[in-house]
């Protein structure tokens, strides 16, 4: 059930917000945005409230408190609207500041509108949704005034926050872990607008995610599909070695989609391995969306392979496609050899036999 909803146009260029009356036929749009934020979108990062007196948290708590005191029926909308307006104004201020910090880079904050909604089925299952959504602007052909609207087909959500709320028997309002989604690496949404504290740092997320994937691949593949294990492991490592916004589900999907195993017998097992990997964030306590911190994976870039007693092959640094440079073969009497592409002349000369 939707207890309360609001829609604001956020205009960074003019420094103004515009509150919009939501007509009945726009309810389906609001419901789709809510459904995306609460059910469909899995690429989120967990945050927690560190100060209940910050603008957004205080306003959300006040809206819920007003609904609770009014019995959740026949709500006094003017009071609720004033708190929603404060949240919209807070976003406007932070987007103006964010725009000023990137203007010299030739970039612009994505234009959009702010959707807010209070939903729930009982006092222990309440959620406040805040979402910045795509809108389009144009000039009216008759009045020549700028207006805006929403695309009927694509309903893009740029950023969102799902705030779970519980009310105990004494009327105390408690916030649960807040799920935040962003479409880029910008941190103003969570840190300066929502003013939340991340539950897991980017460093811990990066480390836990890679180690969890590495362990699952090792359990599932290393014994019988050793070459494929290293290929998939290095695909994951290669993706995480640069600082970027990392959507875990998307990355796993890209790595496995269309992958052609090197060894027989693996094809039929790939889907089940992929599904186990997709369950890891909850099992291993890392977020499905975070900014990668490549520096914590430096040791993971090092591999060692025993050749024979006294000889070891080491892979170091940022080399993640080493499998393309090393091939194995047997000679006519069954002796095993490794053939390594060498671009260093001095090393090559050491091992070159004179004709």
Question: Language-model segments: what does each one mean?
Answer:
Residues 257-355:
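C-terminal structured domains
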